[in-house]
Amino acid sequence: RYHVRGMAINIVTKDYAGTNQLSGQIIGGLQQSKYAKGFGDFYLSMQRGKFGLDAQYQYVDGNSYGESSRIANHPLGNERVHYNDETCQKSFGIAHNYRLGMNYAFSKNHRLEVAYTGKWDKSCSNSNTAGSSESGMHNDSHEYLHNVDVNYSLPFGLNINGSYTNYRTPQQQKLDGTIYTNENTTETERNLTSGSEQTISKWMFTADQTHSLAHGWGLSYGVKGQFTSNKSYQNTLDKEGNILPNATSSVDINERIWNIYAGFSKQINKAISIEASVAAEQYHSPIWDKWRIYPSLNALWNINENHLLNLSF
């Protein structure tokens, strides 16, 4: 019923519906080395009767710098090849992380929750190498994330969830490089430009029903649907602008998951409880279309305040 496979931790926090509370926090800082890096974090939580709101924003902005050097003397046949280089790299980055959540309690066990989480990152780096090889590399990348979650709980034990996630990471990279021989003549030259992007979209919904029966028995059943699209590509061009087939590829995958389950729980006494369920799941992709059965069993025995025995299958 938690829609996870394997071990899970279920955390239930205190419900402040019906109260009036307001809290917030602001954090900021600055780090200085060769270049400066600053960050800020804002958090707000508010509860006004049946309505609750929480908001968070985080900002990071700064530069970084690094240097490295290498010296080597490699055996090659009856000779030795000397190699040395020095590399310096400077990077710039800016990141925004934000969240806005709202909830409304219509009555006891009747609640609506909506939350949005987003991310926007940009990074840029320049690397230059001089010595036995000379190269320059420039990289620009972005990261975008949008996620919306909706949860609706009804008094008779029905819980409906829906979520949408969109993730995108475009990137551009340029490399110019030359490796020299001992006679300081051109050995190998590379001038490449590459672009890549991955876009993932995921829809998911769940519907779960629970019943509390007599004598400590409980019944639960539900369904889950998940639909995912993964589109990615990478293309690489030489200095004349020609596409390199061996370094160019694309992926377009659509996945679908259907899951239905049913289970029961039993509180035998204050110390012993048991929970069991069975799920049937279909996974569909361009190369796979199968049904699988997943049984599970969890037994718990609270021996005393300091000892707990748990059996899971």
Q: What residue spans do the PLM features occupy?
A:
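Membrane-proximal, glycine/serine-rich, low-complexity loop/turn segments characteristic
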Residues: R1-N126, M137-T169, D208-S220, N298
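A short, structural micro-pattern
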Residues: H3-R5, S249, E305
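Short secondary-structure boundary micro-motifs
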Residues: I27-G29, E86-C88, E134-G136, T193-G195, ...
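Extended intrinsically disordered, low-complexity coil regions enriched in Ser, Thr, Gly, Ala
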Residues: S45-Q47, S64-G77, S125-S132, Q171-E183, ...
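Face-selective signature of the C-terminal outer-membrane beta-barrel domain
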Residues: N97-D121, H138-K290
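Surface-exposed extracellular loop regions of Gram-negative outer-membrane beta-barrel proteins
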Residues: R168-P170, H284-I287, W301, E305-F313
